[in-house]
Structures are given as structure tokens and as C-alpha cells.
Curated annotation (Swiss-Prot):
It is an enzyme of class 5 (isomerase). Catalyzes the interconversion of methylthioribose-1-phosphate (MTR-1-P) into methylthioribulose-1-phosphate (MTRu-1-P). It comes from Anopheles gambiae. This is Methylthioribose-1-phosphate isomerase. Pathway: Amino-acid biosynthesis; L-methionine biosynthesis via salvage pathway; L-methionine from S-methyl-5-thio-alpha-D-ribose 1-phosphate: step 1/6. It holds the Pfam family IF-2B.
Amino acid sequence: MTLEAIKYKSGQLQILDQLLLPAESKYIPVAGVKDGWSAIHKMQVRGAPAIAIVGCLSLVVEIYDKQYETKAALANEIGEHLQYLVTSRPTAVNLKLAADDVKGQVESLLANETVTVDGMKQEVIKAIEYMLEKDISDNRAIGDNGANVLVKGVDRPLKLLTHCNTGSLATAGYGTALGVIRSVNERNLLEHVYCTETRPYNQGARLTAYELVHDKLPATLVTDSMVAALLNSRKIDAIIVGADRVAANGDTANKIGTYQMAVVAKHHGVPFYVAAPFTSIDVAIEDGSHIKIEERPEHELTHIGGQRIAAPGIGCWNPAFDVTPAELITGIITERGVLKPCELAEKVRQK
């Protein structure tokens, strides 16, 4: 059985509440844009691709059964909702780019006098629904492209390391970095996968471990602080992580802890790959210094499962992401191939 983080059909949207995993698997309804914003902000759904899809599908739910007198009224409502949704989590670029695409489509339909109000609404709904389908096909391509690079010239199974959660729970299905690992396993060339717990929100322990156990992959959970010791004591063939935003020069914002893994990988001579769809690449940002880093509430650091683990009164710094410099990245695995960071901007412009 395939894991589904997102269930959608005919204007009805449900998401798997990832705050409850792995103890409980519960789907919750998303009845409109406010629910979508809340689910994204509270991290009931997370992962840059999934955030974009849920955000846009919540817009579909919002407008699905409504009637509009004019195309302008529909366009204004869509614009307001999209502007609101992109404030839910600022670092992941996928939702912003998806919102920009929808806005561009709306402007085009608004200018086309042959398109009716209902026709305009249906075209927008159709385009957003296609995002769900396309994300899965893109992830499959990312998995294949990554596996091709990792197994090239290798005559033995691989040991791989990943961080945070980049699988079916972070996307429409299959996953990005975890999709690469799945693809390696499908070729019977995966010896073992290690996943970090990913403090402070424990997406690795709660979600990635959940997916690995579900898929019956040979896997071991380690703490974030064990990565250097792991690379030093056991032969790790490659590290594969996801991305929430990739700048034009290849600098990559991903879950906090990614940067230190890349530094340690460089020291030990372990290839460090980023797996991300083109929707995570933001060529409008020159380099990582311009990426806005979201800071999360203190209680996410001081509490686990509602129980305080830190001394009351201690100050906290809780950035959700860090930026890995492009020079530490071996390659960026996309649905259109594996690229060197310096090749990104040109490849995106060729779309």
C-alpha cells in the first residue's frame, strides 16, 4: 500500500495530519483557504512540494462550488487567497512559484473575452489538479536520475544517508531524496539507509523512519549529532537531501542541520546531493544570502509531545532551515537530470 499525504477528489481535500505520526494515522479535512494556511503553518503538512499542492488545492476547495458574477470578481478572490497562502511558510519557494503560475493563468483568462466566468474557474481548477499528477511523475524522474548517478560504475549495494523527510509524506507521492533511495532499492542496489532524527521537530524519526519501516527498507535511525561519527566509522556512499529553496547559484536552503552534514561530507570525501524539482529552484534569488529563513516558535525546541525538556526561562534560537553553499554540493538531482550548481540558472531559463 502506497502512503498518501494528500487525498483529493472533486473539490474535496484531506491531508494526513503529520503532527500525529507515527502514533496515529488520521486524515483531516481541508475545507478552504483558511484551513490550508493553518495546516501548512502548523506543519500538519510539510515538505515544499506538498505545501504548494495543499495550498493551491485549498484554493480549489474554496472556489469549487461558488458562483461568481464576473471574471474580475473571481480573479480578485483568487489573487487575495493566493497572497494570503504564501505567508504560511516563507522559506519554501514552491508555493510562491505555484501561486505565481496560477496568477499568470488568471490574468491570461481574464484578458480572453471568449472565456466565460465558469470557463475561467474550471480552467484554474484543472490546472491546479494537474499539479498533483505532475509532482508524482517529476518525483519518479528525480528518483531514476539520482539512482542512475549513484549506481554508475558500482558493482555492490550502497549505504546512503538522508536528512529530514523527503518522501511520500513531503510530496504528492514517492518523494525527492527518499524517491532516489527508493529507486536505488528497486534496482536491488540498496544495502542500507541511515536517517537522522532531524531535531527539533523530529521529522526524520517521526516521518522518514515511518516511511522506511512501511516500505520494509533496511534502515537505521541516528541522531543529528552522530553524522560525523557515522561517516568516519561506516562506509557511506552518498548523502541525499531535499530542498525548500535553491538559489540561482545553487546555494540550497533545507531543513536545519543540512549545512553541517555537507561540511562533514566534504571532510570525509562523501558525495553530497540535493534532490529537488525545478519548482524548488528560484533563479530570481542570486544566492543563499537572500533567502528568508523562517524562525519557528520556542516551544518546538523546548517541548516534545507537550512535555518540557528544557529549563524554564532559557532563551531559544529556532531557525527552521539553513543554507548550504553551492561549493559543498556535488550535484542537484532534478526531473530533467543531475546538474552541477553552476548549471542551474541556464537550465531553468531553457524551460
